Design a protein with these regions (language model features):
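A short acidic, Gly/Pro-enriched loop at the edge of an enzyme's catalytic core
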Residues: 211-223
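Class I SAM-dependent methyltransferase SAM/SAH-binding core
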Residues: 158, 164-212
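A short SAM/SAH-binding and catalytic strip from SAM-dependent methyltransferases
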Residues: 221-234
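Conserved alpha-helix/loop element of class I SAM-dependent methyltransferases that forms part
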Residues: 136-155
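C-terminal alpha-helical "lid/dimerization" subdomain adjacent to the S-adenosyl-L-methionine
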Residues: 251-307, 311-312
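A short glycine-rich, Lys/Arg-flanked "PGG" loop and its adjoining helix->strand segment in the class I
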Residues: 236-251
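Amphipathic alpha-helical dimerization/coiled-coil segments
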Residues: 2-6, 82-129
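N-terminal helix-turn-helix DNA-binding core of bacterial DNA-binding proteins
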Residues: 7-50, 74-82, 144-146
Length: 316
C-alpha cells in the first residue's frame, strides 16, 4: 500500500468528527451528487449562510471536502484523496437516500440554473455571435481549431451545445454526417438557418441535454464542446458523455476561456465558472478516460479581454 493511501490515526479521527454531525452528513450526501456553491447549499438546506459556512470549513479542514474559489463565488466538492475516498464511500453507503427532501431541493436548484441559462440563451440567440465577438477574435480561434483538428475527412462529428451552429459551419464540410445538440430551441432554429444558408447538408440538429444525450455510444470521430463548459455545474460529466460518444481513437475538441476575474460574465451572461483551468481540465479528462494530445492559449488583443484555451484529447 502506498504511503499516500494511509490516513493515520489523527487524520482519521478528524475526518470522522468532521462528518459526525447531522448537517454535515447532509452536506456530504449533497456533494456526492455534484459540486455546489455555498449559496446553493444554503438554499437547499434552508439554513443560514454563516452556519453552513462553518460546517463547510470544518469539513474542508479535515480533508473530506475540497474548497475552490471562483471569482466572488466559492464551490465545494468531495475530496478525492486516496486515503479518504474509502471512508467517504462507506459513510455515503451507510447513509442511503433518507434525506429525500434534500434531493428534491437539489433538483429545484438544478432546475433554477437550467431555467436561467435557457432563458438567457432564448433572449440573446439572435445576437449571440456578436456578443462573443466582443471578447474573442473568432478568426484567430477558428484558424487555431483548423490547425489542431487538421483537414482530414471524418465520418461523424457531434457538436455538444451547438449554439448558433458556428462550429458545425466550420467543421461539418469535412464530415459525412454531423449532429448539433442544444437545449435552446431558438439557438437550434438559428443553427439550422445558418447551415442551410451555407449550403451544408447531412447535419441533424436535435434538442437535448449534452450531459445525457441519448445518442449512440462509440458513434463519433470528433466531438466538439465549444464555449459551453463555463455554463455547467458539472463539466466533468460533459467530458464523460463525450468520451462515451467517441469511437476508439476518436478526438474531443474543447474551446473555453482561461480563468479570469470578469464577474460581469457571471452577472450578465450566466457563466457559472469564470474560465476553466488546466488542473480542473486534467482532472475531468482523467476521470473520463481520455488522453491529452495538444493544448494552446490565445491571449486577447485588447483589454478587458479573455484568453481562449483550446484542448484536444483522444480516446484510446
Amino acid at each position: 500500500m502506498k504511503s499516500g493511501d494511509i490516513l493515520g490515526e489523527t487524520a482519521l479521527l478528524e475526518a470522522l468528527k468532521a462528518v459526525g454531525e447531522p448537517t454535515r452528513l447532509r452536506l456530504l450526501r449533497l456533494l456526492a451528487h455534484e459540486e455546489l456553491s455555498v449559496m446553493e447549499l444554503v438554499r437547499i438546506l434552508n439554513q443560514s449562510q454563516p452556519r453552513i459556512s462553518r460546517h463547510l470549513k470544518l469539513m474542508n479542514e479535515a480533508g473530506v471536502i475540497d474548497r475552490f474559489p471562483d471569482g466572488a463565488w466559492v464551490f465545494y466538492r468531495l475530496s478525492e484523496h486516496p486515503a479518504l475516498t474509502p471512508l467517504i464511500d462507506a459513510v455515503l453507503t451507510a447513509l442511503g437516500d433518507e434525506q429525500s427532501a434534500d434531493l428534491r431541493a437539489l433538483e429545484e436548484v438544478r432546475g433554477q440554473r437550467l431555467d436561467a441559462a435557457q432563458g438567457y440563451f432564448e433572449n440573446i440567440a439572435p445576437v449571440w455571435d456578436q456578443i462573443r465577438s466582443h471578447y474573442i477574435d473568432d478568426a484567430e480561434v477558428e484558424a487555431a481549431i483548423h490547425s489542431l483538428v487538421g483537414e482530414d475527412p471524418v465520418e461523424t462529428i457531434i457538436d455538444l451545445g451547438t449554439g448558433s451552429g458556428r462550429m458545425l459551419s466550420l467543421l461539418a464540410p469535412r464530415a459525412q454526417y454531423a449532429i448539433g445538440l442544444d437545449l435552446s430551441q431558438q439557438m437550434l432554429n438559428i443553427a439550422r438557418a445558418r447551415t442551410r444558408e451555407a449550403g451544408l447538408t447531412g447535419i441533424d440538429f436535435r434538442h437535448g441535454d449534452i450531459l445525457a444525450t441519448r445518442l449512440n455510444g462509440q458513434s463519433a470521430d470528433l466531438v466538439v464542446i465549444h464555449q459551453v463548459l463555463h455554463f455547467l455545474a458539472d463539466p466533468g460529466q460533459a467530458l464523460k458523455e463525450a468520451a462515451r460518444l467517441l469511437k476508439p481513437g476518436g478526438r474531443l475538441l474543447i474551446v473555453d476561456f482561461a480563468p479570469h476575474r470578469l464577474e460581469v460574465m457571471r452577472d450578465e451572461y450566466q457563466h457559472r465558472r469564470l474560465g476553466i483551468g488546466d488542473d480542473d481540465m486534467g482532472h475531468w479528462q482523467k476521470a473520463a478516460g481520455l488522453q491529452s494530445m495538444r493544448s494552446l492559449s490565445l491571449p486577447p488583443h485588447q483589454e478587458p479581454g479573455l484568453t481562449v484555451r483550446i484542448w484536444l484529447m483522444h480516446k484510446a
